[in-house]
């Protein structure tokens, strides 16, 4: 939607600028922002009748997450320090199946389990489908919080991660490759690009990751 307004010259985009602080009047009302040009470090004030902070989550607080690397939570932190209310910060969504990476973690969608993917690791030298054993009524379709806790327990408490690492298998190799491509093509491509292995033939290596921050700056009809 914003691009459409840009084309009509109704919106001006400032790229490579960093939000520094809010501009507050004597009554504590927000009247604009101060931002810094990251090319020349110049500061500039932008006054406005209203300010909308659409700055993403806080995934980088966790080091690595499925969020973009610019999701630092810094804008919300600045607003909080200037008097805004930050609510429900304890509600952090953990996704059970993510691909670890040097820069961030990449989401391996739950649709993989929905289409028949199985999670397992080795126990006593044999494949162990621990979700199916612990939760026989649901198996690999347990809710994401239960799946994430189970994987975390297997790796960190039981020490049964693959090759001693915090990893377990998300296995699609028993499924029809054509159906995998049709229904899961996006995550297959991501995994192949970043790992160099074919999930149709080799199980994917995954671990839970911070995914979404459900809380944030408090908004209501007065804010």
What is each model feature region?
Residues 6-19, 86-89:
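A conserved beta-strand/loop element that lines the FAD pocket in flavoprotein oxidoreductases
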Residues 15-29:
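A conserved short coil-to-beta-strand element within the FAD-binding core of flavoproteins
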Residues 39-50:
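Core beta-strand elements of the Rossmann-like FAD/NAD(P) dinucleotide-binding domain
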Residues 48-51, 71-78:
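Extended, hydrophobic alpha-helical segments in both membrane/secreted and soluble proteins
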Residues 53-67:
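Flavin (primarily FAD) binding-site architecture
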Residues 200, 207-223:
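Structured mid-domain segments that build the active-site/substrate or prosthetic-cofactor binding neighborhood
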